[in-house]
Amino acid sequence: MSRMAEQQLYIHGGYTSATSGHTFETINPANGNVLATVQAAGREDVDRAVKSAQQGQKIWAAMTAMERSRILRRAVDILRERNDELAKLETLDTGKAYSETSTVDIVTGADVLEYYAGLIPSLEGSQIPLRETSFVYTRREPLGVVAGIGAWNYPIQIALWKSAPALAAGNAMIFKPSEVTPLTALKLAEIYSEAGLPDGVFNVLPGVGAETGQYLTEHPGIAKVSFTGGVASGKKVMANSAASSLKEVTMELGGKSPLIVFDDADLELAADIAMMANFFSSGQVCTNGTRVFVPAKCKAAFEQKILARVERIRADDVFDPQTNFGPLVSFPHRDNVLRYIAKGKEEGARVLCGGDVLKGDGFDNGAWVAPTVFTDCSDDMTIVREEIFGPVMSILIYESEDEVIRRANDTDYGLAAGIVTADLNRAHRVIHQLEAGICWINTWGESPAEMPVGGYKHSGIGRENGVMTLQSYTQVKSIQVEMAKFQSIF
């Protein structure tokens, strides 16, 4: 693909040049080619985006629930019509295989938007009787202008996960995509405008997180920030949001999630689940189950089943429909993952497979890392304690149920957890003791629109998806009505 035209900001229903004069490049990680130069939003751009959003939000919130619902449903239709085009752009920008982006990224994002479009008429208040002559009623009102700050691993899906409930509740959103993968969020803005969203209700500001993102979190005109990213960045976002104007926050942060295989599990099923929990999207999924706990007596058999499945991974041209494994999102991220792999070797973990870059035709110019499995791991190893966010699995052995629950919970993270077992009683008994916000039994990774997702501990605050997220983008107003004559004590 030839280099794209310089990408601008999207404010008030159209493209506009950044006033900052700063730009950055977005790179195709499969081959190192520059896809586009992208303009970066500065403080003045944030100010005008907020002013635009405030204007648009008043128009949007004044529409009826059904009017808003119809506009968002039109956006869903356009997303599905343009699925293949958007998936190709997502593949170029992220490096993910087209077989994945064309069936998951846009599809699941559109599903979330359709879900919230259908929920809009359900936003309602309540009536509370006090006495014969007085009652209280409540209203759910939008927050106003909110900000979304996205991560680089699921660019358009995250933009939809954040914008769908925000817009459904009557808010306007200013969205800052990751500077690593900024392109499809701009296309989403086009689609919202085409569907009939009032100008200003969805503005997109590409830029560097430490600048554009910080301006958004500090701006007094923004009522809430929804952030997806790493724990360290999330803490800064939360601190800035609170210090500036006590903004509400939703934080979807990192994870180091446990996958527990019990001794009664079907090891074929367990190996399939472990592969999906570690190598889907080349391991760049926040919920990945990278700490795989296996009974000591099952370790050798389990390792052989994992090795057999790694042999079946197809890393190749990302647009080949048979390819199911792509490069990492960027060269700096590849280098970071390689540092973790080197640390694992240094600390005594045994490399079962992988452990280096992929080499040869089609790989040498890209950010490719081989699917890597470490075994003979211990809980104190760096690769077991820290989030790597790459195709790196760590296998650990255990002896008892109580032991594995304790060790699974021995982490600052609490995003996800899963177990594989044939015992239904054990499944629920154990899952109820795991300190994680998203849990799976005999499966892994699905996050449907109806399912609230979010973490415990350092893995986040608040939830995305589900009914409760729609409500989190509203504020409750209570109104007392008195029908009898008011009695003053003065």
Curated annotation (Swiss-Prot):
GO MF terms held by the record: betaine-aldehyde dehydrogenase (NAD+) activity; metal ion binding
Reactions mediated catalytically: betaine aldehyde + NAD(+) + H2O = glycine betaine + NADH + 2 H(+)
Site (Seems to be a necessary countercharge to the potassium cations): E248
Residues noted as binding NAD(+) in the record, renumbered to the chain: G150, A151, W152, K176, P177, S178, E179, G230, V231, A232, S233, G254, C286, E387
CDD domains reported in the protein's UniProt record: ALDH_F9_TMBADH
Source organism superkingdom: Bacteria
Record pathway: Amine and polyamine biosynthesis; betaine biosynthesis via choline pathway; betaine from betaine aldehyde: step 1/1
Residues engaged in binding K(+) 2: L246, K457, G460
Lineage of the species this protein comes from: Bacteria, Pseudomonadati, Pseudomonadota, Gammaproteobacteria, Enterobacterales
Full protein name: Betaine aldehyde dehydrogenase
Family: Belongs to the aldehyde dehydrogenase family.
Pfam family, one: Aldedh
Subunit details: Dimer of dimers.
Single biological process term from Gene Ontology: glycine betaine biosynthetic process from choline
HAMAP family associated with the record: BADH
Cofactor(s), names only, from the UniProt record: K(+)
TM region positions: none
Chain residues that bind K(+) 1: T26, I27, D93, V180
Location of the active site: K162, E252, C286, E464
EC number(s) recorded for this UniProt protein: 1.2.1.8
Role this protein plays: Involved in the biosynthesis of the osmoprotectant glycine betaine. Catalyzes the irreversible oxidation of betaine aldehyde to the corresponding acid.
Keyword tags: Metal-binding, NAD, NADP, Oxidation, Oxidoreductase, Potassium
Top enzyme class: oxidoreductase
